[in-house]
């Protein structure tokens, strides 16, 4: 064993050993308790970042710990390989997306292997592989057969830069989630999946407080995010009537404009209605009203989601049309509002300014009447200022509402619903915020939708025998839209499955969230050419622990749940939910430094080029360049923006490869685990990285020290540490074993809780105790030392497997106890936790005066005798005779004098 800790050599030797043993390949084993632990598969962007390192190390620690405890653990890995970045890189570099993607996969896989992750690479999948996406297409056809997939034309979010449709969840503040371009609204035909058919089940299983919820192993924050996104609302759907006729002379919408409300108790306070820009009444008004036409055109930019509309300025325009109030017969003005979504409900809303904050602001802006119809006792209504109680439905009572006055919220809703139903104009109804999932994308690098377009028979499904529809690998996007339109090879020889005439393929591809909605099931049986999933999924699913960022709380996690339920209903899997437990690891943060350029833009600087300016209290007040950067000399003042998520754009990322090359993979792993609990954010600290490296060097140096002991004595000590039956431990050895096993008990508990930062701190306590032990020659001393270091290596092994393997093998543990790959988790020795003596607090008249040591089994009389004979008692009692002695077992003695 080498004297100096050289991470590159230690890690190279460990990798060679693990590869030779094919250490991490797993198979189904009915004789073992299974555990499926999986990190969200990465997009092959080119290089790992520190967030990847943290995520995968969390997974690896869990995997190795459970294997040491006898579990059959699956830890697979794959690549979310389709998507727009590959097309954009191809456009920039002039190479096909396939080449760019597979080159990145090769490099990132090499990085993962350098990290020493216990991944079963025999189960690797790439979603751009035809053998994988064939099953996307196959299940899509099954969904078509069952009516779960369907085609329709709808207003969608159009990203003008990427030339594609975006799902509602992919629009942020009115802009595309990837490009930042202002999103437009367009009517485009596409394929949709009926996720709404599963809305109630999706809600029931995730809802916080629901006794039928099954996802209790998920963070409440994620569960609430999904619950709010699904958005179940109980209310009343009713119609305002009208006689507005279209160009055909018929009443538009059969003379009814429907709305949905959860506040039917305020129906008597309606003073206007607003319709979406795409509503038939808006289109009718636009034909004769230029202001309406111009407003509708303006509304075609921006998002189509509730989230986007909630943040943008609320605007509207009068249509000049009126509808009739269903209960009062009063005429109600119709407006076009940019905040009304055609895809939600009926594309129209009632306006009650007095009791809805959005309507209140809208009414003040445009001079619309405000009519109070709810009163909370003791409050005064102000027509010029919104107050939160205006919307209070729990404590309010209806007023100014004719026959409905004096009613509570529930009473009024029921009464109004009954009245509307009596008139045939409305009824109680449940609505959902969730909308069907549009999966068509006007891009090349994705799963081809298996549809053939025939002039005679329209859209015809591709026969199953012709799957997969293979994506051409030679396309290089030129920025002018979907290259599949122009790729004649993609359409060559295609015939209609119905009539046999020449036809063309569908050129839309599937949303890449389709790929990630079931990959975790394919891991269970990745090479099966005959079935999407088979017996492997029955053994491994549901996944026991899923690990990934909270940014996937709605998109990926909701779609994966839906996809699993569809597969269940098709008889493909037996589980209702894919993920039993979810851990959302915290972001990795770093300092951000910038300055304004002469042109008004921002220039960001790498942290290693910057030094802080601090006040007397040590608070950072500014920053300056430590080194010259470009034309800027050292000492140039720059702005300190605080800490934020690591990103390339802000030059505050840390390259894991550089970290591994300088300190080794074990240091990178240890640092990301020690600095913060897995679910908390991690603020990068170079000094703490150095500290992690120094700790591992201390571990290695202690191993070298043990290696210097006589080999025969060491081997005998290892054998002794294995059985302990014939070992007589002296006082010093017992004290060491007490400390080691006390820490081990806590560490084991922390491993079970996945609190890996305290696992590492426990390992540090163990090393301190071992280094402080100076009685190797005392009775049982060497055995206690060897046992303790063997425990430390096994505690560290899940976090830092390379150095643990090197020391375990180099010191001879493997010869007696077997390969560390197969070593069981160390068990806490109850005997080691038993103390010959314990320390009790000594009090005199209730005041702390010292401490005494007593035999651990001492009775009350013996404890009293020792207390009264102690030096501390005689010193503080000053000759006073004891009147009473109170003993609290295991804690203290109080002498009353």
UniProtKB/Swiss-Prot annotation:
Organism: Paracidovorax citrulli (strain AAC00-1) (Acidovorax citrulli)
Alphabetized NCBIfam families for the sequence: leuS_bact
Classification lineage: Bacteria, Pseudomonadati, Pseudomonadota, Betaproteobacteria, Burkholderiales
Biological-process GO terms, alphabetical: leucyl-tRNA aminoacylation
Record CDD domains: Anticodon_Ia_Leu_BEm, LeuRS_core
EC number(s) given by UniProt: 6.1.1.4
InterPro entries linked: aa-tRNA-synth_I_CS (IPR001412), aa-tRNA-synth_Ia (IPR002300), Leu-tRNA-ligase (IPR002302), Leu_tRNA-synth_edit (IPR025709), M/V/L/I-tRNA-synth_anticd-bd (IPR013155), Methionyl/Leucyl_tRNA_Synth (IPR015413), Rossmann-like_a/b/a_fold (IPR014729), tRNAsynth_Ia_anticodon-bd (IPR009080)
Family classification: Belongs to the class-I aminoacyl-tRNA synthetase family.
Entry protein name: Leucine--tRNA ligase
